[in-house]
């Protein structure tokens, strides 16, 4: 089977063509030179968490308990904090070699009667766009996951290659979540989550009553309101009925994420929310698992006639534009195609047409990497009526936290901002420009 001559130019064109077709949007027509640019400093938080902020190890714990904003003490200290926390210290037991402690994120915001428009720019550590993602590797008998983010033990030990997509996230509060305006993302980050202290085993999570009820195998972002104890411990969850009441009251956070591999090639971003877990919105994402649960074989392979090969290799897995995009560079997986040990296929396939419901709200998002800088233009519809969204509306102010995942990393290995206010026709730290 031919696998070694994957043509990167052909692959890139095939992977992004669906997204490029959607870029004749209002966002692409904006004269961004007329919209003010705000520079935010995002910093590496290490293993600082909701619980740590309230512990004796944090000098400002008493102020946190009183509801004081993190920025009250630390505004302007982001770069200093990041430089300290990214190195070996009590909050960083597994420092990442060469990891930067800070990222400058330029933010521009505009809106009209129908949409909010965001433009972001940031420099990356990598010398190429971080749009590669872990794959499935054929070992001669089975297809198994291959590649891990840099914090994963297998990547740290060199047992598997460190590989993961770049990502930009916005977490949005409309004032309904107590404490978010002061603490931002730290309200959602807890002991027990992935790559955090006291991470439980899969079996322990599965045995927990809440996690069994919601059918989750690990601990991810959640809000303190969904726990029963003062420490907001992951294991002390409320009932599903109680959590649904919290959601019905609107006391959740919107979490929307642009992903360099799993959404950008089809011109989209995903849509989710944080409550008892980090959930996706109702409907279907643009990215779907490429593993058939019944046959334990991939669903799609590359169309060799279009991209030059049916699979990736170790030499080509990091090349730009390796996403499987249905209808552009894919054919149905053929188990009899002569697969050899070492052949690689992406873990997800992408389908713009297959995305649906509230999960598909972010339909016009364009990310371009050039000269070491990502530029992402993002359209978010105003006045969304879905029960799992925070609707952006004229006349309102929102508390928003930003995060960038860079350099083959996920989970806590990002750089984050303190919460910033954004107003649409209202006074705020960032006031969106009203378009005529």
Cite the ranges covered by each PLM segment.
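Exposed beta-sheet edge/beta-hairpin loop segments within beta-rich domains
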Residues: 365-372, 389-393
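Bacterial N-terminal signal peptides that target proteins for export
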Residues: 2-11
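Acidic/polar low-complexity flexible segments
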Residues: 26-53, 140-342, 385-436
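Sequence context of c-type cytochrome heme-c attachment sites
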Residues: 23-67, 81-108, 130-131
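Beta-strand-rich interaction surfaces with strong enrichment in secreted/lumenal proteins
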Residues: 105-108, 363-369
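Short, well-ordered beta-strand segments enriched in hydrophobic/aromatic residues
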Residues: 115-122, 374-380
């Amino acid at each position: 089977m031919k696998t070694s001559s994957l043509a990167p130019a052909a692959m890139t064109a095939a992977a992004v063509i669906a997204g490029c077709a959607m870029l004749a949007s209002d966002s692409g027509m904006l004269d961004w030179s007329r919209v003010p640019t705000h520079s935010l400093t995002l910093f590496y938080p290490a293993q600082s968490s909701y619980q740590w902020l309230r512990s004796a190890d944090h000098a400002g714990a008493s102020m946190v308990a009183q509801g004081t904003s993190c920025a009250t003490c630390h505004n302007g200290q982001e770069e200093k904090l990041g430089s300290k926390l990214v190195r070996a210290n009590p909050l960083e037991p597994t420092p990442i070699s060469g990891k930067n402690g800070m990222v400058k994120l330029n933010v521009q915001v505009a809106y009209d009667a129908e949409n909010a428009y965001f433009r972001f720019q940031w420099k990356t550590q990598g010398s190429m766009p971080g749009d590669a993602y872990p794959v499935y590797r054929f070992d001669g008998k089975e297809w198994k996951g291959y590649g891990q983010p840099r914090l994963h033990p297998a990547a740290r030990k060199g047992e598997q290659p460190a590989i993961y997509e770049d990502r930009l996230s916005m977490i949005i509060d409309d004032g309904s979540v107590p404490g978010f305006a002061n603490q931002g993302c730290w309200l959602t980050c807890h002991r027990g989550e992935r790559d955090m202290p006291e991470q439980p085993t899969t079996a322990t999570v599965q045995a927990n009553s809440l996690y069994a009820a919601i059918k989750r195998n690990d601990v991810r972002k959640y809000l303190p309101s969904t726990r029963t104890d003062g420490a907001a411990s992951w294991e002390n969850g409320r009932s599903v009925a109680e959590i649904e009441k919290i959601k019905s009251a609107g006391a959740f956070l919107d979490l929307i994420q642009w992903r360099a591999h799993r959404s950008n090639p089809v011109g989209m971003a995903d849509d989710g929310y944080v409550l008892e877990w980090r959930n996706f919105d109702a409907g279907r994402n643009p990215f779907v698992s490429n593993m058939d649960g019944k046959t334990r074989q991939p669903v799609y392979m590359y169309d060799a006639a279009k991209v030059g090969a049916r699979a990736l290799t170790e030499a080509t897995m990091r090349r730009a534009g390796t996403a499987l995009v249905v209808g552009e560079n894919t054919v149905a997986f053929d188990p009899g195609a002569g697969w050899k040990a070492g052949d690689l296929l992406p873990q997800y396939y992408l389908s713009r047409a297959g995305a649906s419901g509230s999960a598909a709200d972010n339909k016009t998002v364009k990310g371009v990497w050039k000269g070491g800088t990502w530029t992402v233009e993002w359209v978010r519809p105003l006045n969304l009526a879905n029960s799992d969204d925070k609707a952006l509306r004229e006349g309102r102010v929102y508390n928003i936290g930003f995060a960038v995942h860079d350099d083959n990393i996920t989970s806590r290995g990002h750089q984050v901002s303190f919460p910033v206010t954004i107003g649409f026709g209202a006074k705020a730290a960032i006031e969106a420009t009203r378009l005529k």
